[in-house]
Amino acid sequence: MTGLTIDFHNIPGAMMRVLNAFTRRGLVIESVWCGPSGDHHRAHVLVDAQAITIEQTVRELESTVGVDGVAPLNESEEATLLRHAKQ
């Protein structure tokens, strides 16, 4: 599993564009959590994919309108998301 955190503007369609970056590549999203973070929103997404696919998805997200940044989740954040996904 790989976890990413994506910071984006709270504008119409922004979350849809973020999630579409994963679904266009045929990735199954295991878990997603989204909430406000200051004047932006932050999504934590957990997917099971090969490293090259994650790299391509990160590049696409970084060029997506409204996305400010993409970073990997640390292991404890990934474990928390996975635990919540299995409940």
Question: Would you name each region that the model predicts?
Answer:
Residues 1-87:
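A conserved regulatory-domain signal marking ACT and ACT-like small-molecule sensing domains
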